[in-house]
Each structure stands twice: as structure tokens, then as C-alpha cells.
């Protein structure tokens, strides 16, 4: 910035390089880079803790951190997990979330002998904090997984100032279902399967906007910038494209959410899997090696094989948890119904009122596909619309449509 204004300059970009190491060398070097990234991010003159879900990513961070604490005579590591009131009672397994975290958290906390805290969130409070989460984000983002991370960070901050967590491992090492699909060509962001479904709830005045065409163009613009090597296999090209899209779009959204929800509560969130050296190395690992044994994050699992329990290593990926409690559903339905009854609501300049009423009457079941990611269905879509109305009002947004 100077007297002539602001100038934007890109200071870093991925580079495509030939990967020359065999599987054994790659596994060993990857483990070394992971440990180094975690240990460097443990350096602090204030209390440090880790988030622990019992999944692969947070478990390895917590394992390395606990060993470092022990080696440096810092006592036991504090680890923190999150859950919602009575979630075990109402939990329903699905393709993306085959089991809840509780069993795995206890197993891993015992394995590393951490001082573990399980933070249980009240479902009504979760709904009531949608506004605070929206204000912390400056945007409507990810519904109740915003407010839950906000409340979780608020509780963790009572015990620590820095928290390490496992975000970015899925984007960097191929943890999402779309990484294992066989694409001839990638025409659309792989996490936007519900785009047409979303268009169906738009207000009639904007329903004809070329939203799908715009999204496809943005996707293709990004793909045109993907660093590649000449002569690579189609599979390796697609892996680079998927990784690039995830790093530039999906991961940025998650990092933005993480940074804003934690820092709104004066908690510094650190993400070792986003370490620059680690990302640069992982980007050039061939697809068959990265998805070792045809599994999501196959190589990452193999690099941790001798250090973590096999149960943890082989546990299927489970996303950040959402509440399944009907109390939450009733709370957000009431909040959205209050918006429907408000003659000054701005929401209906964007969203069709009849579709919203139908969503309330069916408790979100009229919207069957994930709004974002893999779990944002039903009550989460309702919560997102509440966030949208909050944002439109709190920031006095004027729509020129």
C-alpha cells in the first residue's frame, strides 16, 4: 500500500515437481515432515493444547504433542473434544459419519495419557449463538458448526491460549470421497453436488440467474492455473486438479471459519497440516501413492502406522460433528419461523418464502442434500438461513437485484 492505493501481489504458489522417492522413502520422509511441523507449532510461551476427535489427523497431532510434553518435562498434555447434549441417544450413522467420536476420543486420550476435557454443548445455546458466530465471521458460513466451534473455543480458552488441530489434512492428503472418484474431466467443484437443489429455493425474481454457469466458470478458471508436469498420467493430473481446488477453495473456507471462531474467543488456532513445506511435498506425491491401497489418506495412514493404534489408523474419516438432537431442530425452526412472520425480513429477497415455510414444516427434511460439505442437511440448512438473515440485517446489506 502507498499513496497510489492498494496493490495485490501473490507471494507464493504451488510448484509441480517430479517425485523421485519410492514408497518406503516417501513414508519415512512424510512422517519426519509431519513431526517437524507439529513440534514447531508447539513452540509458545503461553499454554498449548490440542483438539482431539479420535480421528486420524487430530490423534497424530495429539500423540506427537504428548510425546514432546513428556520429553520436555511439561507434564500432561491437555486435549479437548466436543459433543452435544444427548448426541449418543440421537446419533444416526450415515455414509459420511459411520460412528460418533466418543469411543475413539476415550481410546486415544488413554493411549497418550492426556489430561482430557470433553466439552458438551447445550443444543438451545448452540442455536442462540448462531448470531455471534455470524458476527465473528462477517459472513453467513457453516451454520451450527460455526456456533459449536465458537462455543467450544470459548470453553477451551479457559484452559489454554494456543490450540493445535487437524484441519487441512483431508485437502492435502486426499481425505474426501471425491478424491477416489474416477473423473474423465472435472467440470464443477466436487463438493457442489447440491447446486441445482439449492437453486430450487431461490426467490423467483432471481431463479433464472446463471448460477451453475458461473460456478463452472470459476472452477475452470482455477483448473487452468493448476501446476502440472508434462507427460503425467491422467490420474495424476486429476489428483493435482482436485488438490488445487481443495486448497484454494474448500480449505480456505475451513481455515477462515477456524481462525474467526477461535480468535473471537482469544484462542490461537494452529494447523500443522497446512505447513508450507508439508503442503509442497504432498502436492507432488503421485496419486497411487497418496491413495495407498485405494483408501482416502492411504499414505498418511501408512506414515503413522507404527505410532498409533491400528483402530485409529483404520478408522473411516468422520467430519466435524453436528448435533442430531431434535431440541436443536425445534429451536432453529422456531427462529426461522419468527423470520417468516417478520414483514421486514430481508431473507425473502433471496430465498423463496414458500420453500422456507416448507422447510420449517418438514423440520428441514424437504432439503435432502448437503448444503455444504457432507453433513449440512436439514436443520443445518435452516440454521444457515438464520445466519443469512442475521448478516443482511446486522451489516445493513442492500441488494441490487
Language-model segment annotations:
Residues 30-38, 60-65, 108, 133, ...:
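Structural preference for long, well-ordered alpha-helical segments in enzyme cores
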Residues 48-56, 96, 270-271, 320-324:
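Glycine-rich loop motifs involved in handling phospho/adenylate chemistry
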Residues 50-53, 78-83, 118-120, 164-168, ...:
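Short beta-strand segments
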